Amino acid sequence: HFDTFYSARYLTTLHLRQLHDLLAGIPYEHIIILANTDHYGGGGIYNSYTLTTARHAAFRPVVVHEFGHSFAGLADEYYYDDQYVEYYYPHIEPWEHNITTMKDFSAKWEDMLPKENAQKRTGKKKRAQQEISPLDTETIGVYEGAGYQSKGVYRSTPNCRMKTNEAAAFCPVCRRSIQRLVQFYTEAGH
């Protein structure tokens, strides 16, 4: 159903138990549910399922975005200028790999940050950041605005599939998270 958490586009299922019962005799690792509607929306529940609408024009980027949530536990990187709720608290590091509050940045993408971009982290090179295209999904830095919040939560690139439908791809940080999970499931001993 739509309107999960009072969001017109957030789509989830109320019948998860029945869904798993229906699939009980079929080997599966991940569930992707396609809703036969042209209404915009979707949802991705980590380690559970991806749900998206199949007939909306933005189906392809939305299903990939929601898969990022459900398969790899990636956070939303978009934000609102008029935020009314703190989803992430400034003194706690989010568990998702692709956003940070800078409380434990070494556990995130600090190792991927080019040395020449290290000063961006401290805000000393604001001008250099402004020269980067807002559609850039590859230039790693620390960019404020993520996790629905315009301030205090950061993402790794100007754009990513977890930020907009216009992004050409996942950013390197998100790709690494996905790759690590695939390796976990496919390496010997798992």
Question: Could you tell me what each predicted segment is?
Answer:
Residues H1-D82:
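Active-site-proximal segment of zinc-dependent metalloprotease catalytic domains
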